[in-house]
Amino acid sequence: MKKLPRYSSLVGVLIFAIIVLPGINNSANAETLNSVSHIHHVKVIENKVLVLTHEGLFELVGKDEIKLVGKDKLDVMGFTSLGKALFASGHPSEGSKMPNPIGLVKSIDGGLSWKAVSLVGKVDFHFLEGAGSDLYGADSQTGNLLYSADSGVTWRSLGANTFTDIAVSPEMSGMAIAIKNSDLLLTENAFKSTTKIKNALKFTQIEWRNSALYALSGSSLYKSTNSGKTWTKISTFKGVPGILSISDQLMLVTVGSDIYTSKNEGKSFKKIS
């Protein structure tokens, strides 16, 4: 039996509730979700579903089937993208010469190879979110939230992390919306100050894609086109969704042990695992 992570509503760096996921038989060209010891997260990058595990970065290539991306089996914890570049944090693979933790590493070939960017041997981000040249990372060792305005080259601490998710504006540097105690907080200066966005909904996950916001509340997916002031329900699930991840081509939502994707901005979803 395999474990799939789900975000908890508790405040902290990043807290996972564990859900059982059934495995299937191995194929000749891929492993299964059941073959890895621990899954940290699931994200979409372009039209691919990537699985972050203790044994490396994998692509979901079939129903419960995964294929290792590249050869380096990093223990991938935090993970995000800025344009075509992938950014990750976590721990080196067994036998690697990389320091532990690996700090922030970057890939410009889709995860086939990685190069150090910053904080090598110092920081283990269990949470990474970014857009444009802005990156936010929550360090599991100190519990602090860090911010970079130059794609992770330099960082400043914002103090103890109190957010469960952050959606970073792709259009304005320093602008982001965070979830704290299920409420939305807007910043235009990288959390030097925040303004609460008044809303009756209680949110668990939020993503910013182009000029639209997408968020999970209860068992439904919502969309906002006015920076979170008003929301329109676009999909409802049988169960409480856990993970929300969005690219220009694909949207992903997990419900319990199931993974769903949408190719029409969340209007309809297909179960893929």
Enumerate the language-model features and the residues they cover.
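Short coil/turn segments that connect the beta-strands within blades of beta-propeller domains
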Residues: 46-47, 83-84, 132-133, 172-174, ...
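Short coil/turn segments at the loop-to-beta-strand junctions that recur within blades
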Residues: 71-77, 120-125, 160-166, 199-204, ...
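Asp-box/BNR beta-propeller loop motif
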Residues: 56-68, 73, 100-118, 146-158, ...
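Residue position within the beta-strands of beta-propeller blades
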Residues: 51, 88-89, 137, 178, ...
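Short loop/turn segments immediately following the C-termini of beta-strands
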Residues: 54, 91-93, 140-141, 181, ...
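Short, solvent-exposed loop/turn segments at conserved positions within beta-propeller repeat blades
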Residues: 35, 95-101, 138-141, 178-179, ...
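Conserved beta-strand position repeated across blades of beta-propeller domains
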Residues: 40-45, 78-80, 127-129, 167-170, ...
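Beta-strand-rich domains and repeat architectures in extracellular enzymes and scaffolds
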Residues: 31-58, 77-78
